[in-house]
């Protein structure tokens, strides 16, 4: 089925964007710019909390971002710093765009005539296209959607690809729909949204994570209740709602990965995924090695069994027999080596409800796991050992634990955090319950 693919965003919004760009350029011309690295370092040092102890750890950069375009943030659920060096924040009002100083530039609140709503994830690819996982209404002949009075009126999960935000000429380049862009259901009777055993339907599926590769191919995670015969999955050819999906850079469906089990947790599973992470990120580089490995956060609903490991790390290996998806034995093995550090990514029961993952695309290679169940941010080195590098001159090379958090509104606390990002030594957290974007930096990164 070919669904309509809207291509434009309202002209009035473009006028506002153009006006803002001129105004901001004028301010820099009259007042000068404070974006040079030396000045930023001085400001960062002056904005840290002086009462914190002088140990290795993350310190807050004040003030936190609380204002989006046209008003305060309302339950921000994700944050991403793009290749264009803008900060993207998704909340109940849409996607806000801020500069690196936290100054709001504009708000994308409507896409092709509908509100931009129920956002779950945002990310930018190397072409500067922005992906937004959200929901959209549509009418489908022959559908059975139970959310409203008309079964042909459906509320479905989508992933928007929006081009031209950086140049001031935004347009919707593509929309990935569930279930229309799931290749396992094309040209079958399951292509149309339907209702399944127990009253669940395609309206219960949601896209939870979006990640890009260096060549702009796309990984998407999806979750929902239809995953086995017992829960209404009609055949093995029909991809489960809990799935890891692959798309080309142009949005063509490639496959869903059958090697990742959908209905039981394991080291190779897509069991109620909440996010997906690849090992590429800003800033822009002339050449980037193509690494297809990925990590998935697992966060089942309270009615389902908890996974032993809340995060899985998967290696993609090309063999003479084709592509294989293997458990990341290196990071898994780190958990069995207590001499390597005081904690590891693969520790049983470590995470309660991991909601977001981030990767430091620099020489550190740090991995960040945001756990809304513990209101905490966990930090690991690239080998999967909990902690960060010790400061120069330290008597030991063991990573130093730097994870932090706790429930509350304090500078090192969170309330149901949903998104984490990293850019140039700064960690950004979408602190949902506190309606803010918190920022942190390692105290050893201040020169």
Regions found by a protein language model. Name each.
Residues 71-82, 113-125, 193-213, 262-290, ...:
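Beta-rich, blade/repeat-based domains predominating
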Residues 22-26:
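C-terminal motif of bacterial Sec signal peptides marking the signal peptidase cleavage site
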Residues 34-74:
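A short helix->beta-strand "capping" segment at the edge of beta-propeller domains
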Residues 414-447:
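Blade-level signature of beta-propeller repeat domains, shared across WD40, Kelch, NHL, RCC1
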Residues 65-93:
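Beta-strand-rich domains and repeat architectures in extracellular enzymes and scaffolds
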Residues 162-177, 245-254, 311-332, 380-394, ...:
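Short loop/turn segments immediately following beta-strands, especially the blade-tip
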Residues 34, 84, 90-92, 134-137, ...:
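Short loop/turn segments immediately following the C-termini of beta-strands
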Residues 86-88, 129-132, 217-220, 289, ...:
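Conserved beta-propeller blade signature
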